[in-house]
Amino acid sequence: MAQKYDVMVIGPVSVDYNIDYLGNERREIGGAVVASGFAAAGSGARTAIFCKLNEKDADVEERFRGVQADVYWKASSATCSIRNQYFTADKEKRQCTSLGVCDPFRFEELPQMETAVYHFAGLVYGDFDGALFEEASRHGKV
């Protein structure tokens, strides 16, 4: 019997360099796919996560350790990477610089399984295109 999911969260893993207003820098592995994936799984929804990254930059198993979801991933020539320079303690003002972009997502590379909702958790222009959204909408809610 094929797997069935309430939601599939799709997006790039990101290597983020976050610099606070005092100049302290933290390297963090995250991105919208990580935050949304943990949130969806934590809600009790049957969750699949599909992400892309270059495996030399981050360990998928380590980053998603403890998530109550099935995690799928595909190698990318590059990993999404963002530098955030914050100028205030409340982090309301920042400069955001793209340092790397993963390969675009295509519907045919997603795990082929029944999914009620496709949640696209992108970070930069080019992660997704209209053809991906159109095809996903034929298979579930977008």
Show which residues each predicted segment covers.
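Active-site metal-binding loops of divalent metal-dependent hydrolases
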Residues: 11-13
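Extreme N-terminal starter segment of soluble prokaryotic enzymes
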Residues: 2-8
